[in-house]
Amino acid sequence: CVSILTLSGCESIERSLKGDRYVDQKLAENSSKEATEQLNKETKQALKADKKAFPQLDKAVAKNEAQVLIKTSKGDINIKLFPKYAPLAVENFLTHAKEGYYNGLSFHRVIKDFMIQSGDPNGDGTGGKSIWNGKDKKKDSGNGFVNEISPYLYNIRGSLAMANAGADTNGSQFFINQSQQDHSKQLSDKKVPKVIIKAYSEGGNPSLDGGYTVFGQVISGMETVDKIASVEVTKSDQPKEKITITSIKVIKGYKFK
């Protein structure tokens, strides 16, 4: 056999000899290597790109973007979503929103000058499932769906990202980066695009880049995010006053292939 990754017949033989676990691990390793190589290639291109290439830096909602309005007990948050760069996260979020999954859920974790987090039916950070859980094992085997990391999306102030319990464990929980601290001086333009470094001067959490799927950006309503971030919390970062999502209205949807 030339390779278990290129010939299905060889893969079958390998499965017989060494078992599914071994072959699946090798397939995953190969897929991860290819993804890393592709990301490195795209990152080099992104470093040379102009501002127009970074959708978070434009408040207008483009044709290939979606838009939602998160109505909370503290006010509204208007967000645009990026299916081009994070199709799984956007489809998951939009579907949950349309089905009312998030209605009534609380912001269970709030850390001022960091982020606000919601999307857990349990209300304590332990729950939440993707739309594919129990339905499509290729997208979610039971632990969540994969991270989608793009050199064109970052954890700048106002960005919407998937919360996870480790790589590729995305379910339904999400957070909005709220920090207003200037992090630009700690970033190198050899690794981060200059326009993004400038954006980080207004806040965000660059330490989260590469570990969490960014899939949206607040285009209005950051005052609501700041209001939520300023409430009194317990030692476990849970608001003493319950803050809930009333509803999430899909203003502009997206047709997935």
Question: What does each model-identified segment do?
Answer:
Residues 10-257:
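Cyclophilin-like peptidyl-prolyl cis-trans isomerases
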Residues 4-7:
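Bacterial Sec-type N-terminal signal peptides, specifically the leucine/valine-rich hydrophobic h-region
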